[in-house]
A protein has these predicted regions:
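A glycine-rich, hydrophobic loop/mini-helix early in the fold
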Residues: 48-105
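Short, extreme N-terminal leader segments that mark the start of a protein/domain
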Residues: 1-37
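Short, surface-exposed ligand-recognition loops at beta-strand->loop->(often short) alpha-helix junctions
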Residues: 39-47
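Hydrophobic/aromatic-rich, well-ordered segments within soluble, folded domains that form packed cores
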Residues: 124-149
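Helix-hairpin-helix/helix-loop-helix acidic hairpins
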Residues: 105-121
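Intrinsic low-complexity, intrinsically disordered or marginally ordered coil/linker segments
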Residues: 2-6, 97, 113, 161, ...
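Short, flexible, solvent-exposed loop/turn segments with mixed acidic/basic and small polar residues
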Residues: 22-28, 63-67, 114-119
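Long, compositionally biased
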Residues: 154-183
Length: 183
């Protein structure tokens, strides 16, 4: 999938993790995924991210490191075309702007999210919008402080329970297929 050189273990480890954690995004059925990734060498990690990005960008998928500590990173894998539509949706933008997002460009929104991840004591709840979660569910999650959901899967569901359960099943099946094919 990524066209890596044989024997490049660290890059292969990152790519396997991307397939494992982000299959629905890779397949184009989900806007984005987010996962934690541990690394040994920051220089090697930066090189791995650069190479993976080069390989995925031509497929319409991009990688951003949202937060990095000594040996761990929070990696955001996304489809810019889908994120563009999301941030230009007025319901999504109303929530984002209430949290201090001031520009609708993809990079400006990602940069604001990075800043909020570094400065907020809690994980920013609007991140669900960056992952393609339904706006109504994100609003209710924030309002209910994560409580009182109808069901829980990829996200906590407050509306359209049956549709969400079907979506979760599609994501799970996609992940299973991608892991069989690519790992």
């Amino acid at each position: 999938m990524f066209n890596i050189r044989n024997g490049d273990y660290m890059l292969r480890k990152l790519e396997n993790e991307i397939v494992k954690e982000c299959a629905p995004t890779l397949a184009g059925i989900k806007m984005a995924n987010l996962f934690n990734y541990r690394f040994i060498s920051e220089d090697e990690f930066n090189s791995e991210i650069k190479t993976a990005n080069m390989n995925l960008n031509e497929k319409g998928v991009y990688i951003e490191v949202l937060r990095k500590t000594d040996m761990s990173s929070l990696i955001y894998v996304y489809r810019p075309s889908m994120l563009f539509k999301a941030v230009n949706n007025d319901d999504v933008w109303n929530i984002l702007s209430s949290y201090g997002y001031i520009e609708r460009s993809i990079q400006a929104c990602i940069n604001t999210l990075k800043e909020r991840l570094m400065t907020q004591p809690c994980f920013p709840h609007e991140i669900g919008l960056f992952l393609g979660y339904p706006v109504e569910d994100v609003k209710e999650f924030i309002f209910n402080k994560g409580q009182n959901c109808k069901c829980c899967g990829v996200w906590k569901v407050y509306y359209n329970e049956q549709e969400s359960v079907r979506t979760f099943a599609r994501f799970k099946k996609c992940s299973e297929v991608y892991q069989k094919v690519f790992i």
